[in-house]
């Protein structure tokens, strides 16, 4: 399992992201691949050296103008795992068995990709998948409080959806 995280000079959020993976994840057979994109802050590079002392973490360097797809693709190419999690650097792990849950869904023959529910710091939903209709695509359950089960309790259910977001 490889966790690919793009980054550019966002040390506070990157540190929180990486620390949450290392400290909270119960699955332990993973690597973290940080894809560096034109950072300029000395502290960022010092952190890369510090965190790379952990054998589960390494950095690769993307040299070129910002292009989210190319940055992610370089991280995936460098990844050694059978599966890849594409994770924004401002993400914090809150569920210890998140990797196991995703891998369990990936094992299904009818699944091509798996997404997770993302929350804003105020505990409202940022993303819970994308629903696609003939003339519209929409983020589901956006801005609902975590405690709101939603229509037919769909906010609390694992669902088969058409798309999962990944934003720059």
What role is predicted for each listed range?
Residues 84:
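Short aromatic/hydrophobic "clamp" motif used to bind/position activated sugar donors
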Residues 48-70, 78:
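Conserved donor nucleotide-binding strand/loop of the catalytic core
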Residues 1-4, 31:
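Cell-envelope/extracellular polymer assembly enzymes that use nucleotide-activated donors
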Residues 19-29:
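Short, acidic, metal-binding catalytic loop of nucleotide-sugar glycosyltransferases
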Residues 29-38, 60-62:
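Short beta-strand/loop segment that forms part of the nucleotide-sugar
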Residues 67-70, 77, 131-168:
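A recurrent flexible, glycine/aromatic-enriched loop bordering the glycosyltransferase active site
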């Amino acid at each position: 399992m490889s966790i690919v995280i793009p980054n550019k000079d966002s040390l506070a959020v990157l540190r929180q992201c990486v620390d949450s993976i290392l400290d909270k994840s119960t699955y332990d057979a993973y690597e973290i691949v940080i894809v560096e994109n034109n950072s300029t802050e000395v502290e960022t590079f010092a952190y890369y050296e510090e965190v790379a002392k952990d054998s589960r973490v390494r950095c690769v360097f993307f040299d070129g103008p910002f292009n989210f797809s190319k940055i992610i693709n370089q991280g995936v190419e460098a990844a050694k795992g059978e599966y890849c999690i594409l994770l924004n650097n401002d993400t914090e792990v809150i569920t210890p068995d998140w990797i196991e849950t995703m891998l369990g869904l990936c094992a299904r023959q009818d699944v091509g990709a798996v997404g997770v529910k993302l929350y804003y710091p105020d505990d409202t939903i940022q993303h819970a998948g994308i629903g696609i209709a003939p003339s519209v695509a929409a983020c589901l359950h956006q801005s609902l409080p975590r405690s709101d089960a939603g229509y037919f309790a769909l906010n609390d259910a694992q669902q088969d959806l058409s798309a999962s977001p990944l934003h720059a």
